[in-house]
C-alpha cells in the first residue's frame, strides 16, 4: 500500500499512519522542533488548525495562519525561525487555491520545508512534488480508500533522509496503520481513478446547477469560471475535484435548516 501511494505521488517512500491526524502530527513532530515556527494556510482541516494553534505551542512550536491564496501573506509571515510552510490546496473548506510554484520559490529561498495536504485532490488530480513540495499528506479515510470503512493517513517523502526520520517517529509514537486497514486502502486504490473522475464529473454538474440557484449566496468550486483562482487551478491541477463550498442566503439559520433536512449527506 505504501509503495503504491509513493509511486502514485512520484515520491521516494511513504509512511502509513493510523489516521490523517496521526500523519500530520508525525510530520510536525519529526521535522519541527521547540523554538521553530510554521506558516500554515488558514483554510485547513479543522483538527490540523487545532493541533497547530493550541497543542504545538505547549511544545514550543508557534504557527502563523495566513490566507495562502494571497502569496504576499505567505512571504510576509516568514520569520528567522520558520521551519515549515504547510499548505492545504484547495483550501478546506473554502476551496481557495494556493499558487504552489510561488510558495516553493519562497521555501527554497529561505531553506525551509514545504508540506502539502493533498487530500482534496488525490494523486489523480494534483502532483505536489512537481511543484517542489518536500512532503505530501493524505487522509486516506477519504478518496484514497473511498469506501467509508477505514480511518487512516499517510506521509509521502522525497528523500531517504526524511523517510528515516519519519519512519522512526511513526514507529515510536505508535500512530501506525494496521495491516487490515492497509489491505482495505490498497483495495480502494484499484478504483481510485474511476471514482475520482466520476465524482468530479458529478460535482461539476451540481456546481453549475447551484451557481444560479436563488437560495445560494455564494459558491466556490474550482471548476467554475467564477472561482477567483479558476485560471490558477487549470494550470496547477489536473481537474477541479469534487468538493463544493456554498454560502446560503439566510446565513447560519438557513444552513442549519438545510443540514437538518438532507438525506444523502452527513457530517464527515
Language-model regions: role of each:
Residues 5, 166, 210, 258-259:
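A generic structural signal for nonpolar/aromatic side chains embedded in well-ordered alpha-helices
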Residues 14-215:
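Conserved PLP-enzyme active-site core in the AAT-like
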Residues 216-268:
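Conserved C-terminal alpha-helix-loop-beta "cap" of PLP-dependent enzymes
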